[in-house]
Amino acid sequence: MALRSVMFSDVSIDFSPEEWEYLDLEQKDLYRDVMLENYSNLVSLGCFISKPDVISSLEQGKEPWKVVRKGRRQYPDLETKYETKKLSLENDIYEINLSQWKIMERIENHGLKGLILKNDWESTGKIEGQERPQEGYFSSVKMPSEKVSSYQKRTSVTPHQRLHFVDKPYECKECGKAFRVRQQLTFHHRIHTGEKPYECKECGMAFRQTAHLTRHQRLHSGEKLYECKECGEAFICGADLRVHQKMHIGEKPYECKECGKAFRVRGQLTLHQRIHTGEKPYVCKECGKAFRQYAHLTRHQKLNSADRLYECKECGKAFLCGSGLRVHHKLHTGEKPYECKECGKAFRVRQQLTLHQRIHTGEKPYECKECGKTFSRGYHLILHHRIHTGEKPYECKECWKAFSRYSQLISHQSIHIGVKPYDCKECGKAFRLLSQLTQHQSIHIGEKPYKCKECGKAFRLRQKLTLHQSIHTGEKPFECKECRKAFRLNSSLIQHLRIHSGEKPYECKECKKAFRQHSHLTHHLKIHNVKI
């Protein structure tokens, strides 16, 4: 059987600096994994070579193309000599140049690494009759001719089609997820073991991969190499810049087939799809609670351990994640870099601006499938949906009263402790919530910023305007499931439901008579001459 050597570059991928910058983070990590795995395979097959510079750089999280340029300056003659030379000592044997880095394929071709089968290879450190090049710079591997033919046949198809040829032989025993490259499995397995071998010397934060540590260290150094030519905003890594640039062109190429929502990044779509599937792959080993995103699990674990890594040097407030600290720090600096072009209002966070702009555009992309009502924010739809389901996940441990919103629970709990920390400087009235104080202060200044376009009536609160507008539209979104009677207000529905249930939660302490509505109790107390 004739043996044919296959070049290392035949199953490797290479990019120019410009091409490298257009790879996203996931693709760069995959590239790094494939190259390290290929090198590991060659070593295990008996290729006695010193570690190439590019492999050392990849292990350290460095950019590979920098090493490529350096290597070509050092050995230009060797590379020219051995790049295309065909040896005729045996039938069709070619020299393998492990540091050649010839640009052959795009990232979609990474799956060809799976064609390397250990049993099919024989290694040789020297071709008979050839003077051995510089130590560690070249090596060759022989492969049966039929395997080379198989390789050549597969390279004749499109890059996308090649992905379907490649299996995923490396399977995680914990969750069953499979990978094309062993190194990917190694990285993935650290999610289950919690192993984070790469530690930041500045803050002690640890990471599973060196590339992640490298990006993190730029937070400390303030290094932002990638600047947007449109708006001048700078980023730590190129992937963040490319995602940002899609905002300017409005590109959202990744669309959810379930609901049609589109995303700029494939990873965002993957996370979003778990809402539809209900998948929560990340489980807390302490309490068993599951999460859709690993970042959510990490934050949850920090809450349990009271481990708060990010502390504000101005006020000492601590945060679970660095992004929270960065947003908070803008409070001290007064920085609000994101300005609305319609009204000039500025925001500390880009997402706040995006949500605000929907006020001007009228965009409400989130629709309730039960009643057809639409919302500008996904969270508002979630809260609204609880009206239909009756879900009240937040329970007071003092009186066991349940609430559909966490903010309602917090507000309610202050009743038990009697705390009203927010005082009005005008009249001295105290409130449990800052939002209540803000609403109250508009009474003193006479501000009513929310005006009805139908009749011109103005309101202090947007919520009041929304309720008022239902008078003009005739909308009654809150329906009783018992008798199908509909109401404009949720509070009216709650009161109505007590007719069916017989519930009378408001009791007179004087005579023990009970009432369905608080206003009825107030009116009744006048009989006893009780001051309210």
Curated annotation (Swiss-Prot):
Residues 6-77 form the KRAB domain. It is found in: Nucleus. GO terms for biological process: regulation of transcription by RNA polymerase II. There is a cross-link at K126, K142 (Glycyl lysine isopeptide (Lys-Gly) (interchain with G-Cter in SUMO2)). A zinc finger (C2H2-type) spans 170-192, 198-220, 226-248, 254-276, 282-304, 310-332, 338-360, 366-388, 394-416, 422-444, 450-472, 478-500, 506-528. Keywords: DNA-binding, Isopeptide bond, Metal-binding, Nucleus, Repeat, Transcription, Transcription regulation, Ubl conjugation, Zinc, Zinc-finger. GO terms for molecular function: DNA-binding transcription factor activity, RNA polymerase II-specific; RNA polymerase II cis-regulatory region sequence-specific DNA binding; zinc ion binding. The keyword Ubl conjugation applies. GO terms for cellular component: nucleus. The keyword Acyltransferase does not apply. Belongs to the krueppel C2H2-type zinc-finger protein family. May be involved in transcriptional regulation. This is Zinc finger protein 82 homolog.
